[in-house]
């Protein structure tokens, strides 16, 4: 038997004091061996200063150092004497200049309406019509409006966004979704030689918008930025005739009692009642034409459902139309002699939502009278799936790289909405 060295003998002899039979295993608590708690330690309790009437607590303020048996002094808040933006402290809500007793329910870009389109229709006093207007569908079916080699060019746009543009094996949605929409808009702009009136339009991004209106006893506001807006020098032509507008008086708006119509809207007491189209006075392209909404979140829980996306499209299109109507006709609530038409397109890079809104009235307080009109064409697939890598089984290419089930009809509707007002 080999003799152990001095340090080894001392380690074996001293292991008995560690517990567990002297085998050198350290003795620890049960929770230290298992999964430890993730709860943060309790904060240190604040020193209580007993305020006894007629007696002044004895503190260590004059000592200039901590004394454990004396009370902690209470110092007044320190003022720098100048405003440091790194340590800005906002005033209490009730002391701010824009504070109001009446709450305002605000809809912004990240609001997801629980009831979706049904809730948006009630908030905007709008009647829903399934399908696109006949005037737009006539542009879809007219071969004269098609682009030369149209289908192949759209396929190239899809492949460029999802395969050629990025160095990643499988590009993310936030990469290919804006690229597909921008490329499709650029393809539509190529018709400017055939339709010179397209030169009277321009697109802008991140335009601020704010519109406020009363709906029954509620004060509502749409506020935020739009991703891309196509504006023009001339407004879109009216879609529904005067007889169709008057026929909306008999339409009854669907309610969703007992759910509150303001559910999922942000309740706020600090707000400003204003109408802002996002453009300064004298802007040469003042009339909104089409709004483009991109649902480019990579994670599924962060994406809008199609119903919620259509509701957001309706509310922002309505807000743009209402702000434009008040700019042209004033703030008086009335039925518009010349209704305002605004279009909207929403997509996640694969599924498209189309919407056309006609604002007929700015009298939104009551549910009676003339209603606004909206036409929707929902869940239009541009393609069903895109293979970034070929599917090979038994050394045979089963699915080649590229889109699956391409639907050219979807781009025709996209192009028809772009050409609406010119053709």
UniProtKB/Swiss-Prot annotation:
Record's subcellular location: Mitochondrion
One Gene Ontology CC term in the entry: mitochondrial inner membrane
Highest taxon, organism lineage: Eukaryota
InterPro entries: mtLSU_mL37, Ribosomal_mL37/mL65
Keyword Glycoprotein: no
GO biological process assignments: mitochondrial translation
Transit pept. (range): 1-29
Coiled-coil portions: none
Keyword Transit peptide: yes
Keywords linked to the UniProt accession: Mitochondrion, Ribonucleoprotein, Ribosomal protein, Transit peptide
GO molecular function terms attached to this record: structural constituent of ribosome
Subunit-level organization: Component of the mitochondrial ribosome large subunit (39S) which comprises a 16S rRNA and about 50 distinct proteins.
Family listed: Belongs to the mitochondrion-specific ribosomal protein mL37 family.
The protein's name in its UniProt record: Large ribosomal subunit protein mL37
Organism name: Mus musculus (Mouse)
């Amino acid at each position: 038997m080999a003799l152990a060295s001095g340090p080894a003998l001392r380690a074996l002899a001293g292991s008995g004091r560690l517990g567990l039979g002297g085998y050198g295993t350290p003795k620890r608590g049960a929770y230290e061996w298992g999964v430890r708690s993730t709860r943060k330690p309790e904060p240190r309790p604040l020193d209580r200063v007993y305020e006894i009437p007629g007696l002044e607590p004895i503190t260590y303020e004059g000592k200039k150092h901590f004394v454990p048996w004396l009370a902690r002094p209470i110092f007044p808040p320190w003022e720098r004497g100048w405003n440091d933006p790194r340590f800005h402290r906002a005033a209490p809500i009730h002391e701010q200049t824009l504070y109001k007793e009446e709450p305002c329910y605000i809809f912004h870009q990240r609001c997801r309406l629980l009831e979706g389109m049904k809730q948006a229709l009630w908030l905007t006093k709008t009647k829903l019509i399934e399908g696109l207007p006949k005037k737009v569908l006539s542009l879809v079916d007219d071969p004269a409006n098609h682009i030369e080699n149209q289908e192949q060019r759209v396929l190239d746009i899809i492949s460029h966004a999802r395969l050629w543009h990025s160095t990643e094996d499988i590009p993310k949605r936030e990469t290919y979704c804006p690229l597909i929409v921008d490329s499709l808009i650029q393809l539509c702009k190529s018709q400017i030689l055939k339709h010179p009136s397209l030169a009277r339009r321009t697109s802008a991004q991140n335009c601020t918008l704010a519109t406020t209106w009363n709906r029954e006893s509620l004060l509502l506001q749409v506020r935020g930025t739009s991703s891309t807006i196509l504006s023009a020098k001339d407004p879109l032509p009216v879609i529904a005739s005067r007889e169709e507008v008057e026929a909306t008086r008999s339409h009854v708006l669907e309610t969703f009692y007992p759910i509150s119509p303001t559910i999922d809207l942000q309740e706020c007491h600090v707000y400003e009642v204003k109408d802002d189209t996002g453009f300064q006075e004298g802007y040469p392209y003042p009339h909104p034409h089409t709004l483009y909404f991109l649902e480019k979140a990579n994670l599924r829980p962060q994406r809008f459902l199609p119903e919620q996306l259509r509701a957001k499209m309706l509310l922002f299109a309505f807000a743009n139309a209402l702000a434009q109507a008040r700019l042209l006709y004033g703030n008086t609530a009335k039925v518009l002699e010349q209704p305002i038409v605004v279009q909207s397109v929403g997509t996640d890079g694969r599924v498209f939502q189309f919407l056309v809104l006609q604002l007929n009235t700015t009298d939104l307080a009551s549910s009676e009278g003339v209603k606004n009109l909206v036409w929707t064409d929902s869940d239009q697939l541009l393609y069903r799936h895109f293979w970034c890598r070929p599917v090979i089984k038994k050394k045979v290419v089963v699915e080649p790289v590229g889109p699956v089930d391409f639907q050219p009809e979807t781009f025709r509707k996209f192009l028809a909405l772009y050409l609406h007002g010119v053709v």
